[in-house]
C-alpha cells in the first residue's frame, strides 16, 4: 500500500510538516463545516495559512456522495489549478475527494461511462490520468477504510445506482488518523461506520485473495470491533475506545484493498443506489442476517477458524450468533424496519439486474438473500 499512514492522538498537528511537499494551492473537500468540524476547519486553515498555502473549499459533500458533487469539485479544482486535495471527513468525503483529485482535468468535465469502464478492476495496473493531483486524507470517522484503499464509491441519482471506481492512484498519498477528531461522532454514525469496519475485515477474509498477512489483520480487526464498537456507542468520548476502532478501521481497510468484499457489499450498494437516504453501514446491516445463514453453510471452515481466533469456540457461541448480537448491541439489527423502504423501492431492489450477474450468476440463493432481507 503506497499510503503513508500517520496514526495516533495529536497527529493532526503534523499537517504543517506534510503539506509543503505537495504545493501551494489546496482544495479542501468536506461536508458543511459546522459544530466540531468548524473548529477543525479553522485549525487546518490556520496551519495552511501559516505555511503560505492558498486554500479553496468545497463543502458540498453529502452522505452517499453523488457524481454531481464530484463534478462540482473537479470544476473547482480544475479552474483554480489546484496542486493537491485535502479530504476532511468520513467515507463520503474521502471517496469524493479521491475522485476529485484523480479526475481533475483541464476541461473540468468527466465522462462517467468511460471512467466506469476504464477503472473497474481493483488489481489492474494502469496509468492514472495525466492531470491527477495528490490526495491527503484526514479521517474523522472509523468506518469506510477509504484512507487506505484504492476504491471510491459514488451514487448516480439519475440511474439509481452506485458506481465503484478502482485505481491505485486512489490511494491517498498521506492519511492522518487522529482519534481525537472522532470523539464527537454521533452514536448512530459510529454504529453504521463501525459495522462497515467489521464487514471489511470479515468479507475480505471470506474471499479467495487472502494471505497470511491479511488473515492476521482480519482477525485482529474483528476482535477489536467485537470488543470496542459496543463500548464506543455507550461511551463515545472515550479516547481509548475511539483509538481501538480507528486502528480496526485501518487494518480492515488494508484487508479490503487486498482481498475485496463479499456479497453484502454489492447487495448493500443496490439498496443504497435506490435509497440513497440509507447509510452504507445500515444497508449492510439489512442484508447481513440472511447472508450469514447462507454463508455459514458454504464456508464452515472459515467460520470455525474465526470462532477459534475470537475465543467464541471456547464459550460455545457461533459466529453467526455473535454477529447478530453485535448488530443488536449497536442498534442495527432491525435496520430494515427503521429504513422506511417503500413497496415500489422494494420492487426496484428485488428486480435489480445486478442480482443476475453476481457470482454465482443467476443464483436463486442471492435473490433469496435480498428478498428475505426486505421482509
Where are these regions (language model features)?
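C-terminal charged capping/lid subdomain of soluble metabolic enzymes
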Residues: 307-375
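Short alpha-helical scaffolding segments that buttress acidic/His motifs in well-ordered protein cores
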Residues: 198-202, 242-253, 288, 323, ...
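Short glycine/serine/threonine-rich phosphate/pyrophosphate-binding segments
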Residues: 12-15, 36-40, 67-69, 92-97, ...
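ATP/NTP phosphate-donor binding region
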Residues: 1-84, 336
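Carboxylate- and glycine-rich phosphate/diphosphate-binding segment that chelates Mg2+/Mn2+
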Residues: 149-258, 361
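Active-site segments that bind and position negatively charged phosphate/pyrophosphate groups
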Residues: 204-322
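Glycine/threonine-rich beta-strand-loop-alpha-helix active-site module
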Residues: 68-180
Amino acid at each position: 500500500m503506497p499510503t503513508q499512514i500517520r496514526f495516533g492522538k495529536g497527529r493532526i498537528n503534523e499537517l504543517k510538516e506534510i503539506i509543503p511537499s505537495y504545493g501551494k494551492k489546496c482544495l479542501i473537500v468536506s461536508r458543511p463545516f459546522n459544530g466540531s468540524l468548524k473548529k477543525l476547519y479553522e485549525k487546518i486553515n490556520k496551519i495552511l495559512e501559516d505555511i503560505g498555502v492558498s486554500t479553496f473549499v468545497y463543502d458540498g459533500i453529502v452522505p452517499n456522495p453523488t457524481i454531481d458533487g464530484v463534478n462540482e469539485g473537479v470544476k473547482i479544482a480544475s479552474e483554480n489549478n489546484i496542486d493537491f486535495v485535502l479530504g476532511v471527513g468520513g467515507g463520503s468525503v474521502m471517496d469524493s475527494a479521491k475522485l476529485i483529485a484523480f479526475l481533475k482535468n483541464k476541461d473540468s468535465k468527466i465522462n462517467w461511462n468511460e471512467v466506469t469502464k476504464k477503472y473497474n478492476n481493483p488489481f489492474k495496473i494502469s496509468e492514472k490520468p495525466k492531470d491527477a493531483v495528490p490526495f491527503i486524507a484526514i479521517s474523522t470517522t472509523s468506518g469506510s477504510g477509504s484512507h487506505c484503499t484504492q476504491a471510491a464509491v459514488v451514487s448516480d441519482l439519475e440511474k439509481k445506482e452506485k458506481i465503484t471506481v478502482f485505481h491505485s492512484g486512489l490511494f491517498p498519498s498521506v492519511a492522518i488518523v487522529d482519534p481525537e477528531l472522532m470523539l464527537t461522532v454521533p452514536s448512530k454514525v459510529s454504529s453504521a461506520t463501525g459495522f462497515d469496519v467489521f464487514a471489511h475485515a470479515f468479507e475480505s477474509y471470506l474471499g479467495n485473495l487472502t494471505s497470511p498477512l491479511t488473515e492476521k489483520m482480519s482477525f485482529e480487526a474483528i476482535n477489536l470491533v467485537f470488543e470496542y464498537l459496543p463500548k464506543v456507542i455507550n461511551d463515545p468520548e472515550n479516547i481509548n475506545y475511539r483509538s481501538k476502532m480507528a486502528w480496526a478501521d485501518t487494518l480492515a481497510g488494508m484487508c479490503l484493498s487486498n482481498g475485496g468484499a463479499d456479497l453484502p457489499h454489492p447487495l448493500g450498494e443496490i439498496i443504497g443506489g435506490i435509497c440513497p437516504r440509507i447509510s452504507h453501514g445500515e444497508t449492510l446491516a439489512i442484508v447481513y442476517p440472511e447472508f450469514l445463514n447462507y454463508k455459514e453453510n458454504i464456508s464452515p471452515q472459515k467460520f470455525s477458524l474465526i470462532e477459534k481466533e475470537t475465543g467464541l469456540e471456547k464459550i460455545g457461541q457461533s459466529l453467526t450468533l455473535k454477529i447478530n448480537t453485535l448488530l443488536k448491541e449497536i442498534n442495527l439489527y432491525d435496520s430494515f424496519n427503521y429504513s422506511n423502504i417503500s413497496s415500489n423501492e422494494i420492487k426496484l431492489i428485488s428486480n435489480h439486474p445486478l442480482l443476475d450477474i453476481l457470482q454465482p450468476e443467476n443464483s436463486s440463493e442471492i435473490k433469496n438473500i435480498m428478498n428475505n432481507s426486505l421482509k
